[in-house]
Amino acid sequence: MLNQFSRTQLLLGKEAMDRLKGARVAVFGIGGVGGYVCEALVRSGVGAIDLIDDDKVCLTNLNRQIIATRKTIGKYKTDVMEERIHDINPDVIVVTHRCFFLPENADEFPFEEYDYIVDAVDTVTAKIALVMKAQEKNVPIISSMGAGNKLDASAFKVADIYKTSMCPLAKVMRRELKKRGVKKLKVVYSEEKPTRPIEDMSISCRSNCICPPGAEHKCTERRDIPGSLAFVPSVAGLIIAGEVVQDIAFDRV
């Protein structure tokens, strides 16, 4: 019978669609990358998704985040994404976690119930903790490396973390994961050399914070605020979603 996933099923097949419908994917970080991951997963037929983020939509998110509009400024990203998901497919089971993932709260998440984990968080500490937890629970994970300060969306690659180059975040992750005995990690990274952002305090979040009320205003604590574009993190997110969908659909993990 014709349905909203009929065109997808023409490529993947009925058995693959059943796998996707029965899968539960956790997306950590619902920002420039993570938002597009969620969008593509839901449009591809994933049946259950966990959304993990404690941030609110900010005016500065409008340039790149799929959940950011004038109407959603000030709303929690998890709430906006949940509403968007149900507008696309009301049958998706959505579990929201209004918090940032940290080593301290890692045990609060039902990792045993996840079929796949997407790491789209910003900090190295959280990324490492998430990778370690996924490894401990034997859950497949894919991690997003740096998408800020990049101009060339065609430079993204899928690779093992130990085969990456150029990306400063990937370099730190390689070092830290090697220390912890992690043998492999699928990542999406850019081979493009980062562009140094223009130093202009008049448009810097560090000195002109406009975070919504109730937000943690962490931008004022950051050493550097990366530049970003609509067509770069979105592509990274779609590539990640493609890997997750194919891994689940074709039982590659």
Language-model segments: which ranges?
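Hydrophobic/small residue at the entry helix of a nucleotide-binding pocket
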Residues: V33-G34
